[in-house]
């Protein structure tokens, strides 16, 4: 049994106007400002693969339940974490939150157990096995999620039905 959970683009606190972004490194051809663009095809890119981060200053505390990365090039051994805090460079205060995000191909995300409220959010990536020599992603995911009030029934499913329609004319 599974639930369907989503975050609308307009509700993504990581890409709204008014929040400011800083990063450990940035490739000038793929600037940090691309993360505030709705187009996944215009990614942000780092210049390294180890200890890379993007920090979001939301301006004021925001409620978050869904976190993640969209359209990334991370290897399956990448260590992905999110830190939330009340001061820049969160992680030093015992009240700060630290969440590990499970790697998934192209989209890595996590639905938090409880809503977290902080002003500063830092996405950390450490990917020593990345053969590209850089880290790239199109969007940070940060916000409240919507979970439908119903879920899938056990045993119920669907299957794609493909038909290959072929018609040979009388001349081949």
Predicted regions and their residues:
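Disordered, acidic Ser/Thr/Pro-rich linker "stalks" and the adjacent N-terminal cap
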Residues: 1-59, 145-172
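Beta-sandwich interaction modules
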Residues: 51-62, 96-139
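Short beta-strand/loop motifs in extracellular/secreted proteins, especially
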Residues: 52-54, 65, 78-80
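A short beta-strand element within beta-rich, extracytoplasmic domains
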Residues: 62-74
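Extracellular beta-strand elements of beta-rich domains used
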Residues: 67, 139-142
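Short, surface-exposed beta-strand/strand-loop-strand elements in extracellular ectodomains
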Residues: 75-88
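Trp- and S/T/G-rich repeat-edge/linker motifs of beta-rich repeat architectures
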Residues: 90-96
């Amino acid at each position: 049994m599974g639930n369907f959970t989503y975050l609308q683009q307009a509700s993504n606190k990581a890409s709204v106007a008014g929040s400011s972004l800083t990063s450990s490194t940035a490739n000038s051809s793929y600037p940090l400002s691309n993360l505030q663009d709705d187009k996944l095809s215009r990614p942000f890119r780092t210049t390294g693969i180890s200890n890379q981060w993007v920090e979001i200053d939301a301006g004021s505390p925001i409620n978050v339940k869904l976190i993640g990365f969209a359209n990334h090039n991370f290897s399956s051994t990448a260590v992905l974490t999110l830190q939330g805090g009340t001061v820049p460079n969160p992680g030093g205060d015992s009240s700060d939150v630290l969440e590990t995000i499970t790697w998934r191909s192209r989209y890595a995300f996590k639905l938090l157990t409880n809503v977290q409220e902080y002003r500063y959010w830092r996405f950390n990536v450490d990917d020593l096995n990345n053969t590209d020599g850089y880290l790239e992603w199109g969007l940070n995911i940060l916000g409240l999620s919507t979970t439908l009030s119903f879920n899938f029934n056990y045993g119920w499913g669907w299957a794609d039905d493909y038909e290959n329609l072929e018609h040979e004319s009388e001349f081949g």
